[in-house]
């Protein structure tokens, strides 16, 4: 998909508004146009990402896997348009369609995936590796609410949920077919069969790690890398036996506990429950990531013997240290 003119950009935006929102340009508001713009650019990056991954596999290039509990990505619309070389085209197309480009760019929320210096460092590394044509992937958790929005009420700070995915979710490409299963609790049984050691978890609680990919465009290159974000879901969304008995809250308890893992970045840990949740987040994130990396390596090479030759795992901080 190539968009090299204002007309092509306008046509693409109008088509996205129609098929994704059932809206015309005249009916669309700034939020819808922001999401339509993001979807158009995401389509371009998705095609380039497929080409990048195919080249990496065919050339058997070594890949960097960058793990961080946070990625402070900021706003992506203007950055991606600039990196893809369509910044002026998008700006002019929006203006000609009756929107102020500055308002559209400003309406995008910051992705609630990071907080401070560590998150910004991770985002910069990922941008730089992409610009340098280095095959790389970032990994983190797809936090539903980020940290919080701050409001001052009667001179006091009030923390409110940051629903960044309402608009920012346009950049996320769900990949449910690549879901991994993370096990918590239970016991482990080991046994030998046909000369091989088998390790079987028993009595565990399963949580599904569902990947949502965010494409990362490099500047002045067709190379596109991926930030893989793990969402947490329960394989059993509802206990029908409890629900049928009127135990509505208990029926959803397992589902709610699973989703808590990906609810917020850095939950308060000044109580035992908070400490437990942070540890669950770290284990969930690392387990899903390693399973994904190993699975993809085996699919390409058929063996783990050369894993160290084709993969480099880098951690940004101590939170994903379990990967070691």
Residue ranges and their predicted role:
Residues 1-324:
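A conserved ligand/cofactor-binding region detector
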């Amino acid at each position: 998909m190539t968009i090299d003119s204002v007309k092509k950009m306008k046509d693409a935006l109008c088509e996205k508004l129609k098929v994704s929102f059932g809206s015309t340009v005249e009916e669309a508001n700034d939020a819808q146009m922001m999401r339509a713009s993001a979807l158009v650019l995401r389509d371009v990056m998705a095609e380039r990402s497929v080409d990048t991954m195919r080249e990496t596999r065919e050339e058997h290039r070594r890949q960097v896997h960058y793990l961080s509990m946070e990625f402070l990505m900021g706003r992506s619309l203007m950055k991606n348009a600039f990196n893809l070389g369509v910044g002026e085209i998008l700006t002019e197309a929006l203006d000609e369609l009756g929107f102020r480009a500055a308002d559209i760019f400003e309406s995008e929320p910051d992705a609630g995936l990071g907080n401070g210096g560590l998150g910004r460092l991770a985002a910069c590394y990922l941008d730089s590796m992409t610009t340098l044509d280095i095959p790389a992937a970032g990994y983190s958790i797809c936090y539903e609410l980020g940290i919080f929005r701050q409001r001052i009420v009667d001179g006091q700070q009030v923390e409110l949920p940051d629903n960044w995915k309402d608009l920012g979710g346009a950049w996320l490409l769900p990949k449910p077919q690549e879901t991994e299963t993370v096990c918590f609790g239970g016991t482990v049984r080991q046994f030998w069969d046909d000369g091989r050691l088998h390790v079987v978890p028993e009595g565990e609680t399963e949580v599904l790690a569902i990947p949502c990919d965010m494409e990362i465009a490099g500047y002045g290159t067709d190379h596109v890398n991926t930030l893989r974000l793990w969402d947490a879901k329960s394989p059993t969304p509802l206990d029908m036996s409890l629900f049928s008995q009127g135990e509505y809250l208990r029926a959803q308890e397992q589902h709610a506990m699973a989703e808590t893992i990906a609810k917020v970045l850095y939950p308060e840990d000044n109580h035992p429950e908070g400490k437990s949740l942070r540890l669950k987040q770290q284990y969930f994130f690392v387990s899903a990531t390693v399973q994904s990396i190993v699975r993809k390596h085996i699919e390409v090479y058929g063996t783990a013997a050369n894993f160290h030759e084709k993969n480099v795992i880098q951690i940004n901080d101590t939170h994903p240290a379990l990967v070691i």
